[in-house]
Amino acid sequence: RTGVPKDAWLVDYEAHSKALQIAKECGVAHFVLLSAICVQKPLLEFQHAKLAFEQELIASGLTYSIVRPTAFFKSLSGQIQRVKAGKPFLIFGDGKHTACKPISDHDLGDFLASCLEDASRHNRILPIGGPGPAITPYEQGAYLFQLLGKTPRFKSVPLGMLPFLAKVLGGVGKIIPSLATKAELARIGHYYASESMLLWDFEKQRYDADATPSYGSQTLFDAYKQWVKEESIPERGDHAVF
């Protein structure tokens, strides 16, 4: 699914709701849900769909563990080939106004599985990130240049470009439906370009890297080193931004 409204409600809500119904019919006692940390500030349709199912699961009577990971390594792998080819690393604004604590597939899978046996993770919403400090897009680029032995080159994309595109495409989309879909994708892009994938402190109204739980052993920079060494970049699919 791409995150557009139709896909979101079919997959993030309806498919999950049917899976929950089947689980209850089969006598399943514990439902572990892979959600996303971005639902803590829901501005997009797919986030509302995810939240709707989270609430349905909580009310189901089953033991639940709702896991909200920060960011996936493969989502942050898209510019390795650009940098290897001598192209600049693309950033929104100065590349320092957002940050994340990404988690590897292996570490996340281990955390999900352990929810079944760890009673402290039962009937809880569990934000989770990977090990180490939060990393900005600028720091991701700087590390790649260092790893590849290249002079750092960044190209800034104006942060206001995406909401402008979304507004234009949304207006024209009332006449040409396919452009309405592109408008939603622009809104999604702007969200991830302007919001950190960290725990949101509702009282202080800011993201808190220190309060974002960490788990596992593999860092994003470990993965960068492995991918560059093996010349193997993960397939991103709908995780692609650049």
PLM features per residue range, with description:
Residues 16, 137, 185-189:
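A general structural signal for well-ordered alpha-helical segments in protein cores
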Residues 20, 105-113, 217, 221-225:
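Short, amphipathic alpha-helical "lid/cap" segments that border enzyme active or binding sites
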Residues 29-30:
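Short acidic/polar active-site loop segments enriched in Thr and Asp
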Residues 26, 39-152, 164-170:
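Oxidoreductase cofactor-interface core, primarily capturing Rossmann-like NAD(P)-dependent enzymes
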Residues 160-242:
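A hydrophobic C-terminal alpha-helical subdomain
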Residues 33-34, 66:
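A short, hydrophobic beta-strand element of the alpha/beta-hydrolase
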Residues 1-25, 38-40:
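NAD(P)H-binding glycine-rich loop region in Rossmannoid oxidoreductase-like domains
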Residues 11, 15, 49, 219:
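Soluble or luminal CAZymes and related metallo-dependent hydrolases
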